Amino acid sequence: MGTPLIGIFLSQRFGAQTIFYVGVATSCYFVSRALFQIPIGMISDKIHHDNDEILILFLGCFIMGIVYILIPFITESWQYFLLMSVEGFGTSMNLNSWRKLFASNLDKRHEGVGYGFYETIMSFATAIISLVGGYFSSLGNVAFEIVLISIGFAIIIGGLVSASILLIKDRKSKNI
């Protein structure tokens, strides 16, 4: 979630209230995420193959991508709160299913290394995206709007790539 950079982006629209709105929106995100993670986990546990996790992962990515595409069009604080709530829902779909799929495909003798690689990749990717996002936000709103929309499409494409897991016939997670 790019809350700090999005907050800077929205500061020209919301003025002095921006910091408060970022706090409310962040709360909306985490409350929504907290409310949906367990029910989504229960749904994915009821079906004993990975097709549901892959579908939930794709839908979560799609929802999260749409949120980033819509952020540049925010004109009112309630829209920001709603979008962050929707992102929380999408994130809960994404994280539950991704973690379950990832864990089921790890080499059991090298789980620590597998998780280490995953977290290293995620940390570097977040650092690079933050750096690029910060740079583009310094160029003005139009450049940052393009970045947000591009991030949205990249997340949706990531969801499509994750759906391609279904094409792998001998995947370990097939019967989880």
Predicted regions and their residues:
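Central cavity-lining transmembrane alpha-helices of secondary-active solute carriers
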Residues: 24-42
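Structural signature of the two symmetry-related core transmembrane helices
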Residues: 53-69
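Loop-to-transmembrane helix entry/capping segments in MFS-fold secondary transporters
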Residues: 19-20, 108-118
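Hydrophobic core of transmembrane alpha-helices in multi-pass small-molecule transporters
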Residues: 78-94
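A membrane-interface helix-boundary motif in multi-pass transporters
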Residues: 135-155
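Helix-loop boundary and gating motifs at the non-cytosolic
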Residues: 1-30
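Helix-to-loop junctions at the C-terminal end of transmembrane segments
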Residues: 38-51, 137
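Intracellular juxtamembrane helix-capping segments at the cytosolic ends
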Residues: 93-106
